Every structure is written in structure tokens, then in C-alpha cells.
């Protein structure tokens, strides 16, 4: 169980920025289209 947080924390640290980047790029695309 000690290894789970070790893997889970960096995973979230990578997934969260990825989602933020994706939503940001979507907003930029929408602004360019409009």
C-alpha cells in the first residue's frame, strides 16, 4: 500500500496539467473560430 501513493501522486500531477492544457487549447480554438 505504500507504493500506491508513490505512483498515484505523480500520476495526478501529470493528468491534472494535461486536462488543464486540453481545456485551455479548446478555449483558444473556440475563440479563434468565433
UniProtKB/Swiss-Prot annotation:
It is found in: Plastid, Chloroplast thylakoid membrane. The keyword Calcium does not apply. The chain crosses the membrane at residues 4-24. One of its GO terms (biological process) is photosynthesis. InterPro entries: PSI_PsaI (IPR001302), PSI_PsaI_sf (IPR036357). One of its GO terms (cellular component) is chloroplast thylakoid membrane. Keywords: Chloroplast, Membrane, Photosynthesis, Photosystem I, Plastid, Thylakoid, Transmembrane, Transmembrane helix. It is a single-pass membrane protein. Pfam families: PSI_8. The keyword RNA-binding does not apply. Its main location: plastid. NCBIfam families: PS_I_psaI. Belongs to the PsaI family. PANTHER family: PHOTOSYSTEM I REACTION CENTER SUBUNIT VIII, PTHR35775. May help in the organization of the PsaL subunit. This is Photosystem I reaction center subunit VIII. The gene is psaI.
Amino acid at each position: 500500500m505504500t507504493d500506491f501513493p508513490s505512483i498515484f501522486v505523480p500520476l495526478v500531477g501529470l493528468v491534472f496539467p494535461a486536462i488543464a492544457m486540453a481545456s485551455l487549447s479548446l478555449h483558444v480554438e473556440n475563440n479563434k473560430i468565433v
